[in-house]
């Protein structure tokens, strides 16, 4: 399914990962790039793909955003022939997750949720504080520009704090684990 979706025009896709290392997935992304698909990846950790290589991956960009939080986004946005589709997944696309575990990959159908997730993705694409872009030689260069600083993680963290304060949730409750070894539940 995933491999069919990345080939449908208009040709653009966006995927945030923690890790991208599976050779079959990387090969299909290369094939999509060669076919003219614009692929934007946000890969926080290990990335076995090489972006921006002429004739192979010039239509692929890889950005890494490292900040205060360790995130595990698994969002897949497909332009899908003009009918945009958004999916969420429970796994990074590493062999151990795809071969040895039961994982979920499901569509987001609520327009309200789609809108919110796209706002978050846009925020990550505008990040110019913790973002680094992969160069064609595999190294990363920090995103620098003179625009107003944008930190996706800080913005989302502050938004969550404001929402919790508006709900008048005490700090000790907000930061307490729901389950611990001492839980009665």
Region locations from a protein language model:
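Short, small-residue-biased leader/transition segments that mark boundaries at the very start
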Residues: 5-20
């Amino acid at each position: 399914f995933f491999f069919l979706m990345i080939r449908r025009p208009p040709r653009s896709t966006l995927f945030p990962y923690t890790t991208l290392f599976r050779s079959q997935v990387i090969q299909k992304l290369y094939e999509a790039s060669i076919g003219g698909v614009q692929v934007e990846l946000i890969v926080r950790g290990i990335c076995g793909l090489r972006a921006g290589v002429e004739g192979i991956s010039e239509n692929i960009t890889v950005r890494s955003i490292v900040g205060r939080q360790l995130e595990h986004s698994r969002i897949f946005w497909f332009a899908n022939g003009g009918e945009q589709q958004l999916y969420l997944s429970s796994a990074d696309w590493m062999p151990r997750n795809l071969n040895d575990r039961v994982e979920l990959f499901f569509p987001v159908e609520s327009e309200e949720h789609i809108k919110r997730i796209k706002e978050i993705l846009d925020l990550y694409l505008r990040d110019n504080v913790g973002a680094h872009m992969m160069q064609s030689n595999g190294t990363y260069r920090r995103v620098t520009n003179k625009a107003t600083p944008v930190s996706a993680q800080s913005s989302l963290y502050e938004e969550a704090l404001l929402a919790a304060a508006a709900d008048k949730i005490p700090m000790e409750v907000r930061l307490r684990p729901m389950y611990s070894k001492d839980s009665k539940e």
